[in-house]
Amino acid sequence: NLYQFGKMINHMVGKSPIFSYGDYGCYCGWGGKGTPVDATDRCCFVHDCCYGRANGCDPKLSTYSYNFQNGNIVCGNKYGCLRHICECDRVAAICFGENVNTYDKKFLSSSRCRQTSEQC
């Protein structure tokens, strides 16, 4: 769920998930359209696509099992929708961590996202 995703982001990046990623670029936050503005926004685009492939549960509300081991995020559910959304969140949190050096506050609340959305 979104709370768990936020905990993963905070663990991997050390930033507030709401203030740093809740309204960033074209895809971080609610909705999404246009072309991702940078690598961080691309992480959100891929995450949105991953959520779109979830079948059988609500990615934003369903609670899955995970933990942190040696700095890594480990999903606990072995299969199914809960495993899928945990992996979506895990991969996105890692992606944010890998791209933290290109994160740019100028893309907070971006108004440039008016084009047609990319395909997943």
UniProtKB/Swiss-Prot annotation:
Lineage start: Eukaryota, Metazoa, Chordata, Craniata, Vertebrata
Subunit organization: Monomer.
InterPro entries from the UniProt entry: PLipase_A2 (IPR001211), PLipase_A2_Asp_AS (IPR033112), PLipase_A2_dom (IPR016090), PLipase_A2_dom_sf (IPR036444), PLipase_A2_His_AS (IPR033113)
Active-site residues (renumbered): 47, 89
Similarity field: Belongs to the phospholipase A2 family. Group II subfamily. D49 sub-subfamily.
Domain of life: Eukaryota
Gene Ontology cellular component terms for the protein in this record: extracellular region
Tissue expression per record: Expressed by the venom gland.
Pfam families from the UniProt entry: Phospholip_A2_1 (PF00068)
Catalysis performed (reactions): a 1,2-diacyl-sn-glycero-3-phosphocholine + H2O = a 1-acyl-sn-glycero-3-phosphocholine + a fatty acid + H(+)
Disulfide-bonded cysteines: 26-113, 28-44, 43-95, 49-120, 50-88, 57-81, 75-86
Function noted in UniProt: Basic phospholipase A2 that inhibits ADP-, thrombin- and arachidonic acid-induced platelet aggregation. It also exhibits anticoagulant effects upon human plasma in vitro. It induces a high hemolytic activity reaching its maximum after 24 hours. It induces a marked elevation of plasmatic levels of interleukin-6 and -10, eosinophil peroxidase and complement lytic activities and it also provokes a drastic increase of lymphocytes, monocytes and neutrophils in peripheral blood accompanied by a rapid intense migration of neutrophils to the peritoneal cavity.
Record keyword Disulfide bond present: yes
Gene3D superfamilies associated with the record: Phospholipase A2 domain
Subcellular location: Secreted
EC number: 3.1.1.4
Organism: Cerastes cerastes
Keyword entries, A-Z: Blood coagulation cascade inhibiting toxin, Calcium, Cytolysis, Disulfide bond, Hemolysis, Hemostasis impairing toxin, Hydrolase, Metal-binding, Platelet aggregation inhibiting toxin, Secreted, Toxin
Matching SMART domains: PA2c (SM00085)
Cofactor annotation remark: Binds 1 Ca(2+) ion.
Name recorded for this polypeptide: Basic phospholipase A2 Cc2-PLA2
